């Protein structure tokens, strides 16, 4: 047994060494086959002799048993966000504030990795817990998934108690490989590596996460007590020595001009990196100066994040195609000569509507400027008339639906053309796709191509038919083996237990979004009560305006829809609200039961963070100001909502007043 113990230790050392060379140094000394052979040997030993399996064994990287859910855990120290800078003027103002408070300063510039912020806790040198950022105060425990990332040491080189923070991300080559696999399996593709990383880390089965080949860069440590570091740069060097991966493309600079040079360098070189970045983080380098400057409620005063502007490129507009959405809206899409934008190849981009095409004088054959809105969604910004070829073609929208041939109409007050044929095949298929989507019934495995096959085979004609599908229906479909069929049927069965708001949103009632679906489900609790409501009742509810009220009542009064609901009931699809009622939340009297509207730009938190916090205190956050609104929180550049609130005599708070009230409650 002594020989076996020695071999286990040897395998640990070899596998950890090879893993570090491959994933951290990007310089492997052995082929993958050698690593796999040694890992398989260790797995076999641990299966036959469980006493040799340790918490830091390299076999942990493979993943373990699937979890039922992720636990919510409070951060020992809040994970704060950074203030943003979008241009040189913002950066110079930041520099001026710094120098006014602490005098001369050295900055540390680091690449802002486009991934998911994580916190890693080590006890006696062992990795014991990993959390997502969450809302900054509470994150999700994704320890088992993080253990599969080779760049995260399971055991530090010294037995310290420490919490480090970093950015988990998906390298571009892993992202391309993952999407190729998803395309083969007729699954929805990830839009970008960031979404792919976030989705991978939230897999309940860590074995799936292990296959995604994620990585991580560590950028900070919570407590410097055990560190011989006087600066951010020295702290990163210490983290390297302990076995953590930090980004090497960092630089110390003496002034704001050095910061601007660093930004200029990486703005031009960002595409050469094997991972996505979306900006630059600038920090005061000296740790004592950081302590002197301190924090606001939401961010450190000694750091700021410069965000890259959306990249614009020029390519050729080859054609314009039309798509019909589930509500009949006909949307033009630009077919482009493939071009790389913000790290991915783009061959299609949104043109939104006919008015935009004409207003921007966009013609087929033009050279056009393309960018990704928010570095995600490609859109055509403008044409370049001076480069227009003689044979460029002015585009005119059709008069009839390209799917069903029905005449297209433009409803008063709308810019979009719409097909109003309720039996239009394109709309019906889009409605089915919407019904199974994540925010609706969330039926995993029922992708677009499978739905199209099922519809064309006349196996499903409406959303209720999904719950009547059998193994015999699914097995003959393309790329549907026994395992995929079993998984899909299980997902369909699971969807029957969704809460009422999922069903309401999934039905695709025009104007009824996710939030309004939640409001109605919570208010009426069952579908049967909803079937009896009137427009007059609905318009009295916050967040349910005239259009939504009319649309919901008209939809639910339709006899075909009532028959559809009965068809769903016959298959035991849940029609009851399962969530927590806002009225049951015991919040602070300052907020509980109040209707609050957020307007304008917030600097110390995002609108989403503010909304979540208010909801946690029992407040109802609405999007419009009415006589029933109790408070309006007005950020920078608040517009018509603030004006309306003033005219109605509604109480108005500035962002700072709101933050002060939060601080009072937290103290």
UniProtKB/Swiss-Prot annotation:
Residues 586-667 form the BRCT domain. InterPro entries: BRCT_dom (IPR001357), BRCT_dom_sf (IPR036420), DisA/LigA_HHH (IPR041663), DNA_ligase (IPR001679), DNA_ligase_AS (IPR018239), DNA_ligase_CS (IPR033136), DNAligase_adenylation (IPR013839), DNAligase_N (IPR013840). It comes from the Bacteria. It holds the Pfam family DNA_ligase_OB. GO terms for molecular function: DNA binding; DNA ligase (NAD+) activity; metal ion binding. Keywords: DNA damage, DNA repair, DNA replication, Ligase, Magnesium, Manganese, Metal-binding, NAD, Zinc. Gene3D superfamilies: 5' to 3' exonuclease, C-terminal subdomain (1.10.150.20), 6.20.10.30, BRCT domain (3.40.50.10190), DNA ligase/mRNA capping enzyme (3.30.470.30), Helix hairpin bin (1.10.287.610), Nucleic acid-binding proteins (2.40.50.140). Its EC number is 6.5.1.2. One of its GO terms (cellular component) is cytosol. It is an enzyme of class 6 (ligase). One of its GO terms (biological process) is DNA repair. NAD(+) binds at residues 32-36, 81-82, 110, 133, 167, 283, 307. The active site is at 112 (n6-amp-lysine intermediate). It catalyses: NAD(+) + (deoxyribonucleotide)n-3'-hydroxyl + 5'-phospho-(deoxyribonucleotide)m = (deoxyribonucleotide)n+m + AMP + beta-nicotinamide D-nucleotide. The keyword Ligase applies. Its cofactor is Mg(2+); Mn(2+). The keyword Transmembrane does not apply. SMART domains: BRCT (SM00292), HhH1 (SM00278), LIGANc (SM00532). Zn(2+) binds at residues 401, 404, 419, 424. DNA ligase that catalyzes the formation of phosphodiester linkages between 5'-phosphoryl and 3'-hydroxyl groups in double-stranded DNA using NAD as a coenzyme and as the energy source for the reaction. It is essential for DNA replication and repair of damaged DNA. Belongs to the NAD-dependent DNA ligase family. LigA subfamily. NCBIfam families: dnlj, PRK07956.1. This is DNA ligase.
């Amino acid at each position: 047994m002594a020989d076996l113990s020695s071999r286990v230790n040897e395998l640990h050392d070899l596998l950890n060494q090879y893993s570090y060379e491959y994933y951290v140094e990007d310089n492997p000394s052995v082929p993958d086959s050698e690593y796999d052979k040694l890992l398989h040997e260790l797995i076999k030993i641990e299966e036959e002799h469980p006493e040799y399996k340790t918490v830091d064994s390299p076999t942990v990287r493979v993943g373990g048993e699937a979890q039922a859910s992720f636990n919510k855990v409070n951060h020992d120290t809040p994970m704060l966000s950074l203030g943003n800078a979008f241009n040189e003027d913002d950066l110079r103002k930041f520099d001026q504030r710094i120098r006014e408070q602490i005098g001369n300063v050295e900055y540390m510039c680091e690449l802002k990795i486009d991934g998911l912020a994580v916190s890693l806790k080590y006890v006696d040198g062992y990795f014991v817990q990993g959390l997502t950022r969450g809302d900054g105060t509470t994150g999700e425990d994704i320890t088992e998934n993080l253990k599969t990332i080779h760049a995260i040491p399971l055991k530090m080189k010294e037995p310290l108690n420490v919490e480090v923070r970093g950015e988990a991300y998906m390298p571009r080559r892993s992202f391309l490989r993952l999407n190729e696999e998803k395309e083969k399996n007729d699954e929805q593709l990830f839009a970008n590596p960031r979404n792919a990383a976030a989705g991978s880390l939230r897999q309940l089965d860590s074995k799936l996460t292990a296959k995604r080949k994620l990585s991580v860069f560590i950028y900070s440590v919570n407590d410097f007590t055990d560190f011989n570091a006087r600066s951010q740069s020295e702290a990163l060097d210490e983290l390297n020595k302990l076995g953590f991966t930090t980004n090497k493309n960092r630089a110390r600079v003496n002034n704001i001009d050095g910061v601007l040079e660093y930004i200029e360098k990486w703005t031009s070189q960002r595409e050469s990196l094997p991972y996505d970045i979306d900006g630059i983080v600038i920090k005061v380098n000296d740790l004592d100066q950081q302590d002197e400057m301190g924090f606001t409620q939401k961010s450190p005063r000694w750091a700021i994040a410069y965000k890259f502007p959306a990249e614009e490129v020029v390519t050729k507009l080859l054609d314009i195609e039309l798509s019909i959405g589930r509500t009949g809206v006909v949307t033009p899409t630009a077919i482009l000569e493939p071009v790389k934008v913000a790290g991915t190849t783009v061959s299609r981009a949104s043109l939104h509507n006919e008015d935009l095409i004409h207003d921007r004088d966009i013609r087929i054959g033009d050279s056009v400027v393309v960018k990704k809105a928010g570095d995600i969604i490609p859109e055509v910004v403008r044409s370049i008339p001076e480069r227009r070829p003689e044979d460029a073609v002015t585009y005119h929208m059709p008069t009839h639906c390209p799917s069903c041939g029905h005449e297209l109409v433009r409803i008063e007050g709308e810019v979009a053309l719409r097909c109003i044929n309720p039996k239009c095949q394109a709309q019906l298929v889009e409605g089915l796709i919407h019904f199974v989507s994540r925010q609706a019934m969330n039926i995993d495995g029922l992708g677009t191509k499978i739905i199209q096959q099922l519809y064309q085979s006349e196996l499903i004609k409406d959303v209720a038919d999904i719950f009547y599908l059998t193994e015999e229906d699914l097995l003959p479909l393309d790329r549907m083996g026994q395992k995929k069929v079993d998984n899909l049927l299980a997902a369909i069965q699971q969807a029957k237990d969704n809460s009422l708001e999922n069903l309401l949103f999934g039905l695709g009632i025009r104007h009824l979004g996710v939030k309004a679906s939640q409001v109605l489900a919570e208010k009426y609790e069952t579908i049967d009560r909803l079937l009896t409501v009137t427009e007059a009742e609905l318009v009295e509810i916050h967040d349910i305006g005239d259009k939504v009220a009319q649309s919901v009542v008209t939809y639910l009064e339709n006899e075909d829809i009532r028959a559809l609901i009965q068809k769903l009931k016959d298959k035991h699809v849940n029609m009851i609200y399962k969530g927590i009622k806002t009225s049951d939340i015991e919040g602070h009297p300052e907020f509980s039961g109040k209707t609050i509207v957020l307007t304008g730009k917030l600097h110390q938190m995002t609108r989403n963070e503010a909304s979540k916090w208010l909801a946690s205190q029992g407040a109802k956050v609405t999007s419009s100001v009415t006589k029933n609104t109790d408070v309006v929180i007005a950020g920078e550049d608040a517009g018509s909502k603030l004006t309306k609130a003033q005219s109605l005599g509604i109480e108005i708070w500035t962002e700072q007043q709101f933050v002060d009230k939060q601080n009072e409650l937290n103290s």
